[in-house]
C-alpha cells in the first residue's frame, strides 16, 4: 500500500521547528537519533524467538545481571540500553544520558562533542512480557542541560537531571506491537508515527491526539488491592459496582503489565491507569520511576488533554530528589483522574460516602 502521501517524522519535525525561527535544529537531530535506536530495537524484537535477544537472561552471557532497580536483566534489556547509548552519544546534541539500566548518569566520551540536552530513557518497558510476545516499548524524555554544564563543558552529575517534568522539552515512547509506533510531543500536541517496514521511515498516522475526558475503562493491578490507600479502594469499588453503584455505569478493568501499552491504549481510546502509592513496601512509596517513566507519559497525557497525577499533586510539578526515584502514578482521562484526586483530598470520614463501601471492599483484604 503506497504511503508516500504521509508526512515523515523528519518533515514533521522540520515544520514544527519553523514555528521557532531561532531554533538551531539540534532538538530535531536528537529526536531522529532516538527514533533510529527505536527502529533498530524494533527489528530485533520482530525476530522474536528466532533471535537470541528474547531468551531467558539467566542462560545468556549478556543478560542475567541485576540492574540498579534490583531486577534481573534479560539480554534484550542490556541490548536495548546499548542501542540507545550508541545511537545518541556521538551526535553532539547531548551533555549526558540517564537510563533505568544504569545506576549513574552516562558521560559523553571526550572523543565526541557535547551539546545542550539531557536524554533520560527506559530502553525497554514491560520486559516481563518479552517471553510471551506481549507488547513492549521504549520511553524517553528530553531536558535542557543546566546553563553551567553547557558553558563549561563539565561532566554532568545526578543533580543536573533532577528537574521537574514541566521542564521537559520533548517526550515520547515507541511501542513494539503488531506495528511499531512512535508517539511524540515537542510541546505542541501529540502525534503518532507508524514505522513503514518498506521505507524504514516513521510516517505520521495520527495528529493532534486527544484523550477522551470520560471513560468506562480503568487499568490497575488488583493483586495489590490489600495494600491500596482508601481513596484508591473507593474509586475501584465504585467502578466495579457498575450500574448498581454510585457511578451508574459499567466499567471494564484492564492490565497488561506494560505501561507503554497501557498509555497507548488510553491515548487512542481513553481510560485511566493507576499504579498508586501503597503500603506494600514502605521503602518504595511508588513502583514507577519519576524521571523516565512518569514524567514523559505525564507530558504526553497533558499535551493530549488528559491528566497525570500522584493522586495528591500533578506529576509534572514534582521536584525529583533522586535519579531513580519511584512515585505513585495515575494518568488518563481528565475527569477520572480529577475524581481520584478529589477522593484523596476529602477527609477520611467522607471516603466511604456509599454504605456499600463503608464496611468492606469488593476486593477482600
Swiss-Prot record:
- Keyword field: Carbohydrate metabolism, Cytoplasm, Hydrolase, Magnesium, Metal-binding
Q: Where does Mg(2+) 1 bind?
A: 100, 122, 124
Example of a GO cellular component annotation carried by this entry: cytosol
Query: Do you know which Pfam families this protein is assigned to?
Result: FBPase, FBPase_C
Catalysed reaction, written as an equation: beta-D-fructose 1,6-bisphosphate + H2O = beta-D-fructose 6-phosphate + phosphate
State any single GO MF term: magnesium ion binding
Co-factor binding comment: Binds 2 magnesium ions per subunit.
- Keyword Manganese found: no
- UniProt cross-references to InterPro entries, sorted A to Z: FBPase_C_dom (IPR044015), FBPase_class-1 (IPR000146), FBPase_N (IPR033391), FBPtase (IPR028343), Fructose_bisphosphatase_AS (IPR020548)
Q: How does it assemble?
A: Homotetramer.
Protein family (similarity comment): Belongs to the FBPase class 1 family.
What name has this protein been given in UniProt?
Answer: Fructose-1,6-bisphosphatase class 1 2
